[in-house]
Amino acid sequence: GEFVSLSIDKIEVADKRGRQTKVADMHLRRVHEANVEKRDNGDVVILNIPMVDQGPKGYCVPATFERCMRYMEIPADMYLLAMAGNTGMGGGTVISTLVNAVQQEVWVAGRTLNTLNGFPTFKELEKYLKDGVPILWGMHSTQWFNDTANRRTSMRKASQPDMWRKIIEKADQKLEDLSSPQRGENLHICIIHGFNKTTQEIAFTDSWGPRFTERWISAKEAEHFSSGRCWVIEY
């Protein structure tokens, strides 16, 4: 399908004919560091990532990229990104095509889009998230994964970190008996935006509306369901 996007801007913005004004790195770093919330239970979570609800259209990839781009002060629109990625109604995006389009927009804004092959180590996750930089995560959003994430997110609220860590360790041991997702099974992209070092968990957010702003899963489970690629927009 074709989409029409109408943008109403101030005269001085329109006069620039779409050229972006780069937000200074130092200013953006301070803003992002201020977005990092450190909780008493050891959770470290990035707040204020814009929510974009993909709705029933299956636009998880363009919606998720829009969220991260807007968080990095880069103008973005889910529908325009969907066209760039040849996204059809109901989903299905040519990732490489979309990434190339995003790279251009990110570069114009003075940022860099880096591809991370494989799932990052916990230390790598910490490095980005502590600085307030979220990670786009390619993964398999299976029924088992979502049921587990929903249950854990609810249960962990009433548990002490040390006790909860033992529960997570037992759960991680059962991964050996869990088959790996098939290559094209339930492919999805969401955003990793938090971690807990004591419990070795990660927080992630989906482009499905406010109810999916923050969910939790163990880092080992996240690696198990990873589709092998992540992306980070850096300064």
Question: What do these predicted ranges mean?
Answer:
Residues G1-V108, R183:
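Active-site-adjacent structural segments surrounding the nucleophilic cysteine of cysteine proteases
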Residues E2, L81, L125-L129, A222:
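Generic hydrophobic, helix-prone segments enriched in Leu/Val/Ile
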Residues T21, T64, P75, A149-R152, ...:
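Surface-exposed beta-strand edges and their flanking turn/coil or helix-capping segments
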Residues G91-T198, I202, E234:
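Predominantly the structural core of cysteine protease catalytic domains
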